């Protein structure tokens, strides 16, 4: 590079982290400038298509300026990127481990992520133009150029990244973030576009008349929905079914499935169901505005949202069940997480309905104390409609999933009480309840003192503490109920799960099923050491009592490091310390 040649040792020493960061930052800058210049030149080239209006916008002088700017950016950025990228690639060729450096993987991942998103959005705009008739006069030259440049940039770096592989832990983590961000984005884009597409079709049905919509059904909004559905679906399919198909052990995959897809679709579905129930109940109570068929316009988005959310939820729930049986060591964990997530969401819906119900009862008490002039006719309709909608959505779900949780306790009480999912669920509810109680008490005491010191009226005091009272009345028994459950779990040793022992099991390979049962009882994994025939198989110890006895003896040992020997009809627990 500087008139001489580097040996492999010299290259390794030269590429320190500081130097590596500098080189990749310069490459990123050069690539951005070069891509911008290429986009400008391609946009001008598209403007030469006969009939394209962009060819005359700004006049000849403007086009010459764009040509000069594009060429200068392309030459400068290309030279900058080419020089430093050539040096980096030379280092990679001489030193293979360099291809797995965290800085390099971060660079490749960021470019792939940015190029993919920019390219897909540009492709959606071009697709809208095609669906709108592909008029040469309205050709989006800039967006077409952006799509081409972003696609070339993405493919080059994606192909390079996949060719080099992802052997290091940082590389796998970065690749996981990249895959699941784009997979999630594609799923959300496709689902939202499909929902709006169905909404457009529903509100254009003839029985609505002209009270809701006007104009043709084939409009730019519908074309945009189709474009988003197509490219969102393609993005989701590529990253979920191709890129993530073998990534079953990744923690990011579990976050994606449980937090984004299952929880997200459940929340969206509950919102849609609650809205439908609320609107229908409100209509039954009467006094709605607008009246007639126009009132049911909400079905245009609520029903599609409910159906799409249900489909997404059902697909990923089935996926969780399939992976649970495909990977038995994660069977209990996967199903357990799903049950507790749904229980938490349904409880939140139920509590919201109860809080509103308590507010209605307090309002009735307030009406009895207030003059009739301060109360509007039919004030209760909206509140009672929302309350009933939340309760109709929350009660069945809560009863179903809470019974599922109680049933799981009867199957494997120790492991269930010690599970992280249960601990997070219980303490999340307890924390929310305690915070709510504290806020309520602060406001009530403040309002009482303020009323006393400022000689305010009783009506003013009532209005100031009403919201705190209605949440306090619901939160207090909720906190008490779940605090009792937590204390009960603690008496069964649930908090011991936070102090996992290092357990090494020496056992014959034929007794693998026994090891799985021991792990289930302990609530965590063990280190398996398979013998080569010296110890007879311990098949006779597979009974529930024997497994519970082994797990209890391991937990009762004071040492955090335990060796477990299992053979034939006996076992031996040996505490040890590493020298």
Which functions belong to the PLM regions below?
Residues 1-12:
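N-terminal amphipathic/basic-hydrophobic helices that include classical n-h-c signal peptides
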Residues 10-510, 514-578:
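Hydrophobic/aromatic interaction determinants used to assemble and anchor large protein complexes
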């Amino acid at each position: 590079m500087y008139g001489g040649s580097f040996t492999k040792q010299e290259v390794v020493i030269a590429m320190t982290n500081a130097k590596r960061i500098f080189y990749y930052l310069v490459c990123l800058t050069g690539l951005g400038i070069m891509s911008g210049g290429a986009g400008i030149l391609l946009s001008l080239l598209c403007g030469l298509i006969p009939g394209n209006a962009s060819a005359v916008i700004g006049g000849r002088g403007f086009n010459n300026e764009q040509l000069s700017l594009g060429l200068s950016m392309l030459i400068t950025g290309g030279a900058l990127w080419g020089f430093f990228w050539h040096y980096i690639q030379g280092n990679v060729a001489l030193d293979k481990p360099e291809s797995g450096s965290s800085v390099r993987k971060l660079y490749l991942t960021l470019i792939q992520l940015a190029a993919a998103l920019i390219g897909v959005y540009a492709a959606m705009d071009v697709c809208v133009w095609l669906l709108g008739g592909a008029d040469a006069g309205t050709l989006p030259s800039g967006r077409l150029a952006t799509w081409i440049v972003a696609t070339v940039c993405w493919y080059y770096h994606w192909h390079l990244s996949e060719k080099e592989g992802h052997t290091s832990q940082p590389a796998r983590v970065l690749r996981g973030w990249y895959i699941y961000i784009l997979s999630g984005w594609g799923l959300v884009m496709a689902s939202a576009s499909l929902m709006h597409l169905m909404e457009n079709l529903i509100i254009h049905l003839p029985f609505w008349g002209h009270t809701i919509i006007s104009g043709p059904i084939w409009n730019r909004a519908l074309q945009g929905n189709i474009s988003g559905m197509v490219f969102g679906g393609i993005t989701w399919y590529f990253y979920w079914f191709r890129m993530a198909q073998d990534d079953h052990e990744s923690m990011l995959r579990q976050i994606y499935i449980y937090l984004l897809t299952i929880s997200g679709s459940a929340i969206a579905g509950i919102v849609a169901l609650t809205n439908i129930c609320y609107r229908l109940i409100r209509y039954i109570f009467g006094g709605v505005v607008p009246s007639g068929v126009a009132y049911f316009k909400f079905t245009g988005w609520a029903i599609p949202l409910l159906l799409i959310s249900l489909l997404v939820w059902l697909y990923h729930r089935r996926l969780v069940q399939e992976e649970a049986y495909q990977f038995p060591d994660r069977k209990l964990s996967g199903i357990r997480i799903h049950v507790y997530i749904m229980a938490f969401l349904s409880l939140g819906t139920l509590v919201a309905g109860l809080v509103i119900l308590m507010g209605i009862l307090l309002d009735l008490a307030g009406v009895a104390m207030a003059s009739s002039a301060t109360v509007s006719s039919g004030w209760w309709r909206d509140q009672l409609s929302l309350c009933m909608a939340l309760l109709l959505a929350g009660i069945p779900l809560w009863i179903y999933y809470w019974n599922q949780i109680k049933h799981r306790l009867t199957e494997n009480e120790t492991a269930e009480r010690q599970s992280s999912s249960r601990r997070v669920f219980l303490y999340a509810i307890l924390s929310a309840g305690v915070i709510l109680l504290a806020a309520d008490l602060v406001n009530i005491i403040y309002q009482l003192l303020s009323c006393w010191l400022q000689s305010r009226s009783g009506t003013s005091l009532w209005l100031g503490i009403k919201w705190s009272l209605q949440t306090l009345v619901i939160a207090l028994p909720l906190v008490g109920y779940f605090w009792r459950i937590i204390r009960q779990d603690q008496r069964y040793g649930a908090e011991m799960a936070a102090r996992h022992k290092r357990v090494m099991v020496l056992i014959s390979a034929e007794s693998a099923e026994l090891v799985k049962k021991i792990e289930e009882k302990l609530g965590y994994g063990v280190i398996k050491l398979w013998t080569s025939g010296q110890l007879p198989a311990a098949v006779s110890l597979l009974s529930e009592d024997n497994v519970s006895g082994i797990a209890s003896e391991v937990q009762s040992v004071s040492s955090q490091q335990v060796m477990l020997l299992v053979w034939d009809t006996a076992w031996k627990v040996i505490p040890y310390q590493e020298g």
